[in-house]
Amino acid sequence: MFKVKKLNLESGGTQSVIMSKQNAYGMNVNVADRVEIFWNSGSLIAVVELCERTVPPGTVGLVKEVWENRNIPDEVHVRSMPKPASVGYIRERLMGQPITPEKIREIVFDIMHNKLSSVEAAYFVASAYVQRLSFGEEEALTRAIVEAGETLSFPKKPVLDKHCIGGVPGNRTTPIVVSIVAAAGFTVPKTSSRAITSPAGTADVMEVFSNIKFSNEDLVKIVNEAGASLAWGGSLWLAPVDDILLKLRYPLRLDPPSFLLASILAKKFAVGTEKLMIDIPMGKKVKDMASARELAGRFKNLGSRLGMQVEVLITDGKQPIGHGIGPVLEARDVLEVLQGRGPSDLREKSLLLAAKLLEMGGRPDSQQLAQQLLDSGQAYQKFKAIIKAQGGNPEVTLEDLVLCTQIHDLSATEDMTSVQYDSEVLIQLTRMAGAPAIKGAGIYLHVLPGGAVKKGQKLITVYAGDDTRLKTVQDYLERHSPVLACQRVLESV
């Protein structure tokens, strides 16, 4: 028997147990080996870490991932366990060998149930760089991710959805597109992510308007009531192993296309999507047209294997879209476009995407219909219905969407006929200001890309979360310009 010491430490996802070297060597286990911790009413598998002082002999230290959601007694039994067979399957992939759907399913199952360490699971992701997953392996991975969670079904068909692979500051088309398409009578169970490296995700923006965290049962009720949802996927038991894989990919920014494809399509498949429109902005993430076309083809191929119609739009992702970057500022853009105003570039792209999705739903008059639903206010009414169903205030106004009060303005130092922004600098500035954690932090672009500006005219306003963040922003701006070299006025005659 071992005494239990609950440690206020997180391992980053791995179920770890910390043992004294004396106890570990006595059991013939070493670092990264596995042990089973068991007691009268339960058990778990944990990965061993060794120490000399933190945990004395006769005691096991449990990280928060192990004890936080379990009723573990003060004393437990511990015994050594062999490495799971899935470790060998990962080694096969690293050696360039294809693996069967059954082996992929077992790897995903073991990741889901914490039988693999984070290092071992990360090697599975990295194996896609050694040799790209085949079409069959991509399908097997996607289906295994879906099988590890629950699936939803909606009575009203067809079920439509859209996804953007990201990389463009602002670009908050999703709430507008979903509202337009749902206003046309289609079912759109949209779930979105929070920001990881960007200034805001769709979930962060929607949290400005309403609750975004729901159970699977609640999501079904919302969609059946409002015709659509704009919820956070992380609170749902839909493809939960994908969230584990995303955490593994984040530290080294591992983003192999096969895992990107499986991640996106697994979550769409889990909510019963039949027709999916993918937006691939060519710019930061996808560098050229050849790469964009290849990725589009792979999306369509995998979608077909899953019985899903996938259509892809390759769009220009080199410049930000909309006036705002950051949760509240982007929420303001969304509200203004739905109310018939707002930035023209965001409106135009939203109409383009909505028309494509309506066309996929069988509406040949898709362009005219999308514009009519937006201009008539029907899309706005649908957005309000979604907000209400999600527990928010459907009568929210721009004045209710409060910005941070620490402000820094940046003005043009010369006349320019066509302003172009450095998206990477804008992203860094917005995160330095406090977004997405501080909802009212971000950047407002007074001049949209391509617009003309006079010397001394205000270009950008930064809203920072506090004095310290404001100072960080100001220091950064002394070394980096958010404006790229662009067309300047040489002479006025």
Regions found by a protein language model. Give the residues of each.
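General beta-strand structural signal in soluble alpha/beta enzymes
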Residues: 161-162, 188-192, 215, 230-234, ...
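Long, compositionally biased stretches
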Residues: 1-95
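Glycine/serine-rich anion-binding loops at beta->alpha junctions
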Residues: 159-182, 186-198
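Well-ordered secondary-structure scaffolds
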Residues: 96-106, 111-113, 151-153, 255-256, ...
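Phosphate/diphosphate-binding glycine-rich loops and adjacent basic-rich segments that engage nucleotide
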Residues: 226-273
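A glycine-rich helix N-cap at a beta->alpha junction
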Residues: 205-229, 297-303, 307
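Active-site-proximal beta-alpha loop/turn segments in soluble metabolic enzymes
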Residues: 125-129, 162-163, 202-205, 240-250, ...
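Acidic, glycine/proline-rich low-complexity segments that act as flexible tails and inter-domain linkers
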Residues: 81-169, 208, 382-390, 493
